[in-house]
Amino acid sequence: MCIRDSKKVAGNEFERKNGAYTLHLLAPAKVGLPYGTVPRLLLAWLTTEAVRTQNRELFLGDSLSHFMHELDMVPTGGRWGSITRLKDQTARLFASTVSATYADKRSHTEAGFRLADRSTLWWDAKAPEQAGLWESSVKLSETFFNEVIAHPIPVDMRAIRSLKKSPLALDIYAWMTYRASYATKPSEIPWQALAMQFGSDYAQVRDFKAAFLDALKKVLIVYPEARVSHGDFGLTLAPSRPHVRKPTKALPGPG
């Protein structure tokens, strides 16, 4: 989640670099790129469900209201309401194509994939409580599903819901609990590197640092087990207990 921009991006391409790693997100011009908290909530739910069910085919419930409840969103109508935002960001996310490149002096590796092969949404915005004739569903792409199963991010959806008003806090939480799941010794990450990794739009690193530390306070309320400290140079993460234990067995399901 920490690689999604928290603000609307002009155009239909988004690129972010972090050292030798480059992420490129492409969306159809008429659909646009996903942004804000809603795609983060969707990604957290999708990856959690994929690991829980071990299946590429995920069912979103028989009504719009039911699924919004899963994301801790209250259905509201109108042009700027939550229903409009959810439908818009869902379309943007499922239509996007991701490519990741790692290139240094010795190697060049590239991988690309869609998040979803198919999505079918039987949602009536005028009657969010009403069940559709069929249950809404999404079929994750095989590449994305396999990546999720092989490298699950151990997030607690209750924490995700409580942080939903802050895109940066959501990104920090997912990043910290993922790092905690494999860290074996303390590591210090420079503020400059963090600003690049989290897609900062701040003009100065010190401004990003202030925003990051403010969001970190919110994260530590829901994830107090995280062992983290900060100084002038950067942020230090020590091995911590993941917020959610990773599954002991992760085998792809049918489909």
Task: Provide a role label for each language-model segment.
Residues 4-255:
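Charged, alpha-helix-forming regions
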